[in-house]
């Protein structure tokens, strides 16, 4: 009766599932035609159910009507993305030209906002980036490099593929940096700023393409406050490196610290002695993979220059997260007085580094005679 009603044989659930499986197999086989090696590997994993992409693709297709048109679009888009990743086009990762995400999106889809945060295709790209990083064996570097700063994990993952999520407001403020490009060539621009004795804002796109970075005497002094940094730069004469975090570290500054650690640079960091400043200092020490010192952030330093600025009880609760043995004593002194301490009060002490660096240079010259 049902066959008469539907004017043909009735398809059961088993037959329907088999038919859909055949359609998906044909769709995946079609997507492989003309795809590059990486994209073919990705499609093979989907076919063999070795990744979470097939359930995701099925879900997206059902949401769009379930006629496989959306599935075909997503597979085609996935192939185009994987074939066009900057990291796949570069001869070596260190020489990889980083691309802005909006430019990449425009080239792939015609829409610079196609992969914006919060969009479905933006989530799809994120899944492809994570798959790529896992399959190319660079996952450890991406996740381990975010220690203390998990918010930057996504940016680091994208950078592994050669994509920059943000650059306009992402720069490192530094003086005394020597750098080499991915090909090993000396970065003439950074060399020029060093010779002129001037600080420079270094964009993320530049740092991402560097193979190495160093500074005079392999000593880098970092401050949190821009006004303190400006005064130090005014007295600076290329005897060391100077850097300004300007509050919470940017991704670009962390990348620069990675390169400095690889070159054996010794870091001295000075921040405000308030709850936020102590936590930033603690995170930076945990992050840096080289020799790291707190610079005038001890309990004794705090007692020398405590201000009249009160710290609210809510902010004082943040001090419970200070676990570093050196900073814990400072946090206890801060909690006891309830007053903050700001870097501007220590300018005279900070400026002593230049006298010490000058004395060190004179002493080394004397020994060299």
Please report, for each region that a protein language model flagged, where it lies by residue.
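Nucleic-acid enzyme cleavage-core boundary/entry regions
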Residues: 1-244, 249-262, 276, 282-283, ...
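Hydrophobic/aromatic beta-strand patches that form the interior of the parallel beta-sheet core
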Residues: 221, 243, 268, 293-295
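Structural alpha-beta junctions
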Residues: 265, 287-293
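Acidic beta-strand-to-loop metal/phosphate-binding motif
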Residues: 265-274
């Amino acid at each position: 009766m049902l066959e008469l009603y539907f004017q043909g044989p009735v398809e059961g659930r088993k037959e329907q599932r088999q038919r859909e499986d055949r359609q998906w197999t044909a769709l995946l086989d079609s997507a492989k035609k003309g795809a590059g090696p990486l994209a073919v590997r990705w499609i093979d994993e989907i076919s063999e159910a070795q990744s979470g992409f097939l359930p995701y693709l099925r879900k997206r297709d059902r949401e769009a009507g379930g006629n496989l048109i959306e599935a075909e679009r997503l597979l085609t888009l996935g192939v185009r993305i994987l074939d066009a990743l900057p990291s796949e086009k570069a001869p070596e990762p260190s020489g990889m030209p980083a691309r802005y995400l909006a430019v990449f999106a425009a080239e792939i889809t015609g829409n610079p906002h196609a992969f914006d945060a919060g969009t479905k295709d933006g989530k799809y790209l994120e899944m492809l980036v994570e798959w790529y990083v896992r399959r190319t064996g660079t996952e450890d570097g991406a996740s381990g490099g975010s220690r203390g700063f998990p918010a930057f994990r996504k940016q680091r993952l994208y950078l592994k593929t050669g994509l920059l999520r943000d650059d306009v407001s992402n720069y490192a403020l530094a003086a005394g940096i020597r750098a080499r490009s991915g090909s090993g060539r000396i970065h003439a621009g950074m060399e020029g700023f060093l010779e002129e004795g001037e600080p420079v804002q270094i964009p993320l796109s530049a740092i991402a393409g560097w193979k190495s970075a160093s500074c005079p005497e392999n000593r880098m002094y970092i401050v949190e406050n821009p006004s303190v940094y400006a005064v130090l730069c005014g007295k600076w004469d290329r005897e060391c490196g100077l850097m300004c975090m300007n509050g919470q570290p940017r991704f670009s500054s962390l990348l620069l610290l990675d390169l400095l650690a690889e070159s054996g640079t010794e870091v001295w960091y000075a921040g405000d002695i308030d709850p936020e400043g102590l936590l930033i200092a603690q995170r930076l020490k945990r992050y840096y993979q080289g020799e790291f010192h707190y610079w005038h952030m001890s309990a004794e330093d705090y007692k020398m220059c405590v201000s009249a600025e009160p710290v609210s009880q809510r902010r004082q609760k943040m001090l419970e997260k200070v676990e570093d043995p050196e900073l814990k004593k400072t946090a206890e002194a801060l909690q006891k007085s309830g007053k903050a301490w700001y870097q501007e009060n220590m300018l005279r002490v900070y400026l002593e580094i230049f006298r010490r660096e000058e004395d060190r240079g004179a002493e080394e010259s004397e020994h060299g005679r």
